[in-house]
Each structure stands twice: as structure tokens, then as C-alpha cells.
């Protein structure tokens, strides 16, 4: 799913049907659903964030944000992607986000991303912890439990 900020709204591509939806910034924490397929916009699948909207989403989200910094050329990143997507489906209480480090160098630099994949957990806009490397499903669950619960 891709999120793009437009004035006080964000354009969000549905992670299920890929139709673009306009969501008011103040509704980021509501159970916003796709106008086309009716499925949740912010639960069940990772949300693609960019340099343009990363800070806005972190500031507006009342849910903890789990960010995966990755790149398309990175083999371990590609291998970890299904594990991350499955975790997003299991944990609607968190906002799972993906940031392509090649397409978004500014936020990658601000977050001091030195290796990929790197996961960073945020609560109320503040980084709580980070871990680098492709994790198994069990390792990811253990890390989430230790950091966010």
C-alpha cells in the first residue's frame, strides 16, 4: 500500500485491491476501509511509506509502527518480505510500514539505516528499538513481544 499526503488528507492505495483512497489525516487511527473493496486500509498488510509522508504517519499514528527498511536488489529483504506481511496480517494492533531505502534516501539517512533489512519499532513517533537482518517468523514475533508489549 502506498500513502501520499494531499493537504490535510493522505492518498492511500488499498493493499488488497490497489485502488487509491483519500483519507483525512485525523482518520489515520480510525478503522478506515477501502471505498472499493471495503477491506481495512491500515490493517492486514504493510503500508509503503516515503520521505514525503513518513513523519506525518509516525506523528498521527496512535498504534505502534513497525518499519521495515529494505531495497529491491537485496536478497535477504526479498526473503523477509513474506514474513513481514504475515506478521502484519496477524497483528492489526500495529501499523506495519515498508520503506524502500533506494527510493527514500532522506528518511533512511535520518534513521541512520546502515544495513538492510532493518526493522525499527516506533511508539508515539519515537524509535524504541531496531534490529537488522532477515528474521524468521519466530524471531520477529519474539522481537515484537519484547519491544511493543
What is each PLM-predicted segment?
Residues 23-32:
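Short linker/helix segments within small regulatory modules
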Residues 21, 41, 81:
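Cys/His-rich microdomains that often coordinate metals
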Residues 49, 69, 80, 84-106, ...:
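Thiol-based oxidoreductase modules, predominantly thioredoxin-like and allied folds used
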Residues 14-17, 34-37:
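Short cysteine-rich clusters marking metal-coordination/redox-active sites
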Residues 46-64:
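A short beta-strand-turn-helix
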Residues 38-46:
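Short Cys/His-rich micro-motifs in 6-15 aa windows
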Residues 115, 120-149:
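Non-catalytic, surface beta->alpha helical segment in thiol-disulfide oxidoreductase systems
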Residues 62-65, 69-73, 115:
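Short pre-active-site segment immediately N-terminal to redox-active cysteine/selenocysteine motifs
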Amino acid at each position: 500500500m502506498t500513502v501520499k499526503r494531499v493537504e490535510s488528507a493522505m492518498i492511500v492505495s488499498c493493499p488488497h485491491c490497489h485502488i487509491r483512497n483519500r483519507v483525512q489525516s485525523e482518520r489515520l487511527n480510525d478503522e478506515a476501509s477501502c471505498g472499493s473493496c471495503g477491506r481495512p486500509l491500515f490493517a492486514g498488510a504493510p503500508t509503503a511509506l516515503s520521505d514525503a509522508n513518513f513523519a506525518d504517519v509516525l506523528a498521527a499514528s496512535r498504534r505502534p509502527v513497525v518499519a521495515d527498511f529494505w531495497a529491491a536488489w537485496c536478497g535477504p529483504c526479498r526473503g523477509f518480505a513474506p514474513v513481514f506481511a504475515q506478521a502484519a496480517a496477524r497483528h492489526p494492533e500495529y501499523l506495519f510500514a515498508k520503506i524502500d531505502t533506494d527510493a527514500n534516501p532522506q528518511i533512511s539517512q535520518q534513521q541512520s539505516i546502515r544495513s538492510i533489512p532493518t526493522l525499527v519499532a516506533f511508539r508515539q513517533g519515537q524509535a524504541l528499538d531496531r534490529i537488522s537482518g532477515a528474521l524468521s517468523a519466530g524471531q520477529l514475533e519474539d522481537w515484537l513481544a519484547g519491544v511493543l508489549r
